[in-house]
């Protein structure tokens, strides 16, 4: 079996698998490979346990500006449309209601203004008053005593929307389709990349077991591991990494759909939200928490897996200065300490209950169950030159046949949009064709019309 490929993708999560499919379906590349360190695809950040299983299109994510929401909506549409085109309803993609709520007068005023801006972007977006929310999500309004909560509440959202996705199963489908299209493609599992070497006009991707695959172009979609690989080759040395791990709590099946809350604009992390679990029936997840930890991948044991690569990246004065500046802000400091407490046995559950009751006021301590083994690390990029935290996705384009992607949320939602960008870059670099018009026709006709 030949180990030479036009392109090799490092990382078998949903982003890597989306590019594997996109190159196979729409480009003239002959052979593409994925190398993945786990024994199965999509076992880390794309696992159904690692994320909130949400297609983040911007309609109920209150930290998105209208400008960002317009872009994210188009990205989300591609992912949703792919699943619907392939007939993956109720297997990969699920329909449910969803809403964002404001609790209290200040948040309600914010939500009213937000609705006026966002109803032009999202066709069919409905505004819900307290009574309508009670009809749609009774447990958001009813208190423990059966009496309606006293706070003013307003929201907006959709009564039905294809908003829930199992990104692990989506990853598997991308790969199945790609292998049908190009039988010479290859997937290498249990292939943990040790290093990447440039050899004349090709790259050698070398595993810890001394296996080698070769490619004219390498795309690194390895989540938290992308930046250490980049720095091992001399790229991205001006960047650091702040790994933020999210945890969840289970509660009984008390929500009919997704319920999001207003996010503090100072905080670069999602506000607590409620999501009926698409995989574990009868359970609703509340979360995520946000805990910084010295690890590129989450493990059950606190001391297990502390990352030497991370220490190499972050043990410098610029990163310490960024961390000091962040912690100097009282709201951020309190948020960090509060989330540390959430992880503690016994006391953490008691402290988290108050946050969870913002969504379901009748919740009791007995209703909360820490979701062991759920949640994963999201790499937040630190710019050492600008001395600040960079929110969102980060890409290192070398223009030398290798690109590195760091894709925290909403990276899974945007997987096909990111795959489009990467596939066009790869095809252009290799002198191959890419059928952009057919891509838009299949997955985003709106952009074709514009």
Curated annotation (Swiss-Prot):
GO terms for biological process: tricarboxylic acid cycle. The FAD is tightly bound. It is a peripheral membrane protein. GO terms for molecular function: 2-hydroxyglutarate dehydrogenase activity; L-malate dehydrogenase (quinone) activity. It comes from the Bacteria. Pathway: Carbohydrate metabolism; tricarboxylic acid cycle; oxaloacetate from (S)-malate (quinone route): step 1/1. The keyword Hydrolase does not apply. Its cofactor is FAD. It holds the Pfam family Mqo. It catalyses: (S)-malate + a quinone = a quinol + oxaloacetate. Keywords: Cell membrane, FAD, Flavoprotein, Membrane, Oxidoreductase, Tricarboxylic acid cycle. Catalyzes oxidation of malate to oxaloacetate in the citric acid cycle. Donates electrons to quinones of the electron transfer chain. This is Malate:quinone oxidoreductase. It comes from Helicobacter pylori (strain ATCC 700392 / 26695) (Campylobacter pylori). The gene is mqo.
């Amino acid at each position: 079996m030949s180990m030479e490929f036009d392109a090799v993708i490092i990382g078998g999560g949903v982003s890597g698998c989306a590019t594997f499919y996109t190159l196979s379906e729409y480009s003239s590349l002959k052979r593409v490979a994925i190398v993945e360190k786990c024994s199965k695809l999509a076992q880390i950040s794309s696992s159904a346990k690692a994320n909130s299983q949400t297609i983040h299109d911007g309609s109920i994510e209150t930290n998105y500006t209208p400008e960002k929401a317009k872009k994210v909506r188009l990205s989300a549409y591609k992912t949703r449309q792919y699943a619907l085109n392939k007939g993956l309803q109720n297997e990969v993609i699920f329909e449910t209601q969803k809403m964002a709520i404001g609790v209290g007068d200040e948040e309600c005023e914010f939500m009213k203004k937000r609705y006026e801006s966002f109803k032009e972007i999202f066709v069919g977006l409905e505004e819900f008053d307290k009574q309508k929310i009670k009809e749609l999500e009774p447990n958001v309004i009813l208190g423990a005593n059966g009496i309606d909560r006293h706070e003013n509440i307003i929201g907006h959202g959709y009564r039905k929307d294809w908003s829930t996705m199992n990104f692990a199963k989506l990853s598997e489908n991308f790969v199945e389709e790609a292998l049908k299209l190009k039988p010479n493609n290859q997937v290498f599992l249990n292939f943990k990349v040790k290093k990447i070497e440039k050899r004349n006009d090709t790259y050698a991707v070398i595993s810890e077991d001394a296996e080698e695959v070769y490619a004219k172009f390498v795309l690194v979609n390895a989540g938290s591991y992308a930046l250490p690989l980049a720095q091992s080759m001399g790229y991205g040395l001006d960047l650091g990494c702040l790994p933020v791990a999210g945890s969840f709590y289970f509660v009984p099946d008390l929500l009919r759909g997704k319920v999001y809350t207003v996010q503090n604009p100072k905080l670069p992390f999602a506000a607590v939200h409620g999501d009926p679990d698409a995989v574990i029936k009868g359970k609703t997840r509340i979360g995520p928490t946000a805990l910084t930890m010295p690890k590129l991948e989450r493990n059950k044991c606190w001391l297990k897996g502390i990352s030497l690569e991370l220490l190499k990246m972050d043990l410098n004065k610029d990163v310490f200065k960024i961390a000091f500046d962040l912690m100097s802000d009282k709201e951020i400091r309190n948020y960090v300490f509060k989330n540390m407490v959430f992880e503690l046995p016994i006391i953490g559950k008691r402290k988290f209950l108050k946050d969870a009751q913002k969504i379901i006021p009748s919740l009791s301590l007995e209703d909360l169950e820490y979701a062991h083994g759920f949640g994963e690390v999201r790499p937040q990029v630190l710019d050492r030159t600008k001395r600040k935290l960079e929110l969102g996705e980060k890409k290192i384009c070398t223009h030398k046949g290798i690109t590195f992607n760091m894709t925290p949320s909403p990276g899974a939602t945007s997987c096909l949009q990111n795959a489009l960008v990467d596939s066009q870059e790869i095809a252009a670099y290799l002198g191959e064709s890419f059928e952009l018009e057919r891509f838009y026709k299949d997955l985003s006709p709106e952009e074709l019309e514009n």
